[in-house]
Swiss-Prot record:
Localization (cell): Cytoplasm; Nucleus
GO biological process: L-methionine salvage from methylthioadenosine; methionine metabolic process
Lineage: Eukaryota, Metazoa, Ecdysozoa, Nematoda, Chromadorea
Signal peptide: none
Main location: cytoplasm
Name of the molecule in the record: Probable inactive acireductone dioxygenase 1
A GO cellular component entry from the record: cytoplasm
InterPro entries linked: ARD, ARD_euk, RmlC-like_jellyroll, RmlC_Cupin_sf
One Gene Ontology MF term: acireductone dioxygenase [iron(II)-requiring] activity
Family, per entry: Belongs to the acireductone dioxygenase (ARD) family.
Entry keyword set: Cytoplasm, Nucleus
Protein purpose: Probable inactive acireductone dioxygenase.
């Protein structure tokens, strides 16, 4: 996982890093303090360790339902979906995502017009707290497979 402050008004391709200049990286601890976002590294190759970590998160967050969500250029209406995912949104429950394959960005907005970009990759589990404005996009590779966790079954494919 890599985390940095984004430029205030990013222009051009949203899938690029959009660092402020000079780059201002932050740690997972700082991300937690600034935005309440939690981060866990999950070893997907160690089944016992993975199950233990996921079980703890599921219990702590009252998870009762999971699904797999894949974003790739081959999906129907890819460009429209990416526009939709990049629109800032605020959820009524925590957004819990484990990257199973690929890489993507979650942008979080702890203060008005102050975005922090979080690049997550295989094995990264991120918990964005309910009520925090956030958005989602891919990297230029246009591929990510995410396991999502919910406290109830949801309909449709939200980002």
């Amino acid at each position: 996982m890599q985390i940095w402050h984004m430029e205030p008004f990013p222009c051009g391709d949203r899938r690029l890093p959009h660092h402020v200049f000079p780059p201002k990286k932050i740690t997972t601890t700082q991300l937690g303090q600034l935005a309440g976002v939690q981060y866990y590294k999950v070893d997907l190759d160690d089944t016992a360790s993975m199950k233990k970590r996921l079980s703890a998160v599921k219990t702590e967050k009252n998870v009762t339902f999971t699904d797999m969500f894949t974003v790739s250029e081959t999906m129907l209406e890819f460009d429209d979906k990416m526009e939709q995912f990049y629109e800032p949104q605020v959820q009524k429950e925590d957004v819990i995502s484990l990257v199973v394959e690929g890489t993507c960005y979650y942008d979080v907005e702890p203060e008005d017009d102050s975005w922090i970009r979080v690049q997550v990759e295989k094995g990264d589990l991120i918990v964005i707290p309910k009520g925090l404005s956030h958005r989602f996009t891919t990297t230029p590779q246009n591929f990510v497979k995410i396991q999502r966790f919910f406290s109830r079954k949801v309909e449709g494919n939200q980002g």
